[in-house]
Amino acid sequence: VVGSEALAYNVDEGLQIYGGVGFIEEYSIASMYRDERINRIFEGTNEINRLIIGGTVLKKSILEELPIRDLIEMRAVNWLPDLNLLNEEPLKAEARAVEYSRSFTLFCLHESILEYGQDLKNKQWIIEPLSNMVISLSIMDTGYKRYIQIKSGEHKDETRDILKLSIVDQFENCYNNGLDIIKDLFSGEKLADKLSL
């Protein structure tokens, strides 16, 4: 989902740079645009892929193939566990954003299962934003872990700046999708209580 959407975005932006001549076959962007469209047709739509992601997470959670029950209980008490980061850690705020997103995603999954049970798989208006949260969390988490593995001097400063921007973008995406789920699940005082968390 992420790769095909990133490719689609970049090719579309490249086409915009060329303007009307971007569709002329003499320019390489024309074949890129055509190939990208064909890829998306053969791949299937990302909306279906999102339903598959959400359904898989739901199934593995209910069957306890994903050991999240204890994690949900722990995160319900403390959404930001101690990360044991050094004070001079340059990405301390970003690490906290990743963990907050993990807690928020687990919270939304848990509340959705409590509300709908196994019927959640049929609630596409919940499954899609939940899948978006999982995708955003995956991007943030893997990006942060990959950054940690980079040795000093191997473009670490440039990578840090890109990672910061990516985490801000994905955190906002995760948060907004979570709010959509909460607003679908709750109303009135219960909604206000959940939003106060």
What are these regions (language model features)?
Residues 1-197:
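Alpha-helical interface subdomain recognition
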